[in-house]
Amino acid sequence: MSSLEAFPVLPVASNSGQAFRETTADGYSLGGFCWRHQVPDATRPLVIINAATSVRCSYYARFAQYLFAHGFEVITYDYRGIGESRPASMRHFKASWTDWGALDFEAMLQRAQRLFPGQPIDVVGHSFGGCAAGLAPSADQLRRLVTVGAQFAYWRDYAADSRWQLFGKWHVLMPLLTRVFGYFPGKRLGWLEDTPAGVVQDWSTPSAAYEQRPSARALVDLPFARVRARTLAISLSDDPFGTVAAIERLLGYFEASERSHLRIAPGDIDESRIGHFAFFHSRFQPRLWPIALHWLQQGQLAEGTPGRLISPGA
């Protein structure tokens, strides 16, 4: 097992990737970006980055460039209704969490297999993006999976000291405003991107099982069990969404995968705060990004990795 100290801090290129459009199975056009090396290599892994709910793919550009600098091909993209994939009007635009995984992420897998034939496919999923990784019909093609704060927002799993505040914000106020506007106007509130009503309905439904969320009820079966990727779930101890219970709830669906849950406290890396979003901030390139990088490269944790294992190799 190698050490995290073996990873040099490489300069991250300033390019934003090559823009592309990809059409889903139901005919929707998605926008995204691709970092591709000039010299083809059938053994070079491709990483698809699945964003958190209503977070633009541009948020992950620096992390994508970091992976590219370490030899990966990388795809980032926006789910339907978000960023590069936003429609002309958000009012009553139809999209759901299940659409984001079963149609949008699936379209990226199809693109990967078409343009990078035979190359290993890995995924990094942030928040709901980790859940989306298990919803695509072709998810059995994944080699390795890294999730960060990945869960599907069951309110009782929120951190006890902020549970009722989060419940009021995301499970009362958000759906109420969505009924008024026909979508959630997150941008004008400064909370997140504007969000389709169907996604809000999935998020705010207070059910402990994903199959009980509105958009999942029509699924004949859940594709999660098809995933056999070697999986690392990273959680942060000061993330009020990504509690141990929340992370383990989602991990339980990936029953055919070898799963490890690494929990990191800010103090483990001499920081006072990390939270739900900051893992992908470039200031954490030297201390957090190598954890994901090593897993993508080797399928295991490096010696000296900060944090503690909650469920190693479950």
Question: Positions of the model-derived regions?
Answer:
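Conserved alpha/beta-hydrolase
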Residues: 57-89
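Short alpha-helix in the alpha/beta-hydrolase fold that links the catalytic acid
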Residues: 229, 242-253
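Catalytic active-site module of serine/aspartate enzymes centered on a nucleophile-bearing elbow/loop
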Residues: 264-314
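Short beta-strand/loop motif that positions the catalytic acidic residue
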Residues: 227, 233-235
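N-terminal cap/lid segment of alpha/beta-hydrolase-fold proteins
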Residues: 2-39
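Active-site glycine-rich loops that stabilize anionic/oxyanionic intermediates
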Residues: 44, 49-55
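Alpha/beta-hydrolase active-site loop
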Residues: 94-115
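Alpha/beta-hydrolase-fold enzymes
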Residues: 124-211
